[in-house]
Amino acid sequence: MKKILYYSAILISCVLLTQSGVVAQVKHKPVLNHIALYVFNLEKSTRFYRDVLELEITPEPFNDGKHTWFKIGDYSQLHLIEGAKQITPHEKSSHICFSVKSVKEFIVLLDKYKIDRINMKGDSKSPTIRPDGVSQIYFQDPDGYWIEVNDAKL
């Protein structure tokens, strides 16, 4: 009888542990790990993201001269991968967005690097003001990928 109770307890424990693991997996939400951009000229793109967006370069495991990784959040990175055969056009609606304290101050930096910018409609260099009061501008990196910079309070 003691053996039956002992094995029953083990069986019930295993079932409960398995079920709790499944529940934990269902409750786990994915977190953004990285965004990868395929670039034509890694050196030029690296300078852009390092100098214009002032992103911090982080070590990458390949060390093959074809990758640059940047820290873009506590747990997220931007990966640049060299190998694109050409620069291709991209739609502005597909973009990466970074928030800054002041869009006006960021525009000064864009002007310093002679980087063209537009609003969401594409008809002005002035920032778009969203219905929630956030200012935003758009510009392109050396490979034509669109970037939004706004002053959203996170």
Model-found features: residue ranges?
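Vicinal oxygen chelate
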Residues: 41-43, 96-143, 154
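Mid-chain, structured segments of secreted extracytoplasmic proteins
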Residues: 67-111
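Exposed loop/turn and edge beta-strand positions of beta-sandwich/beta-sheet ligand-binding modules
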Residues: 64, 92, 133
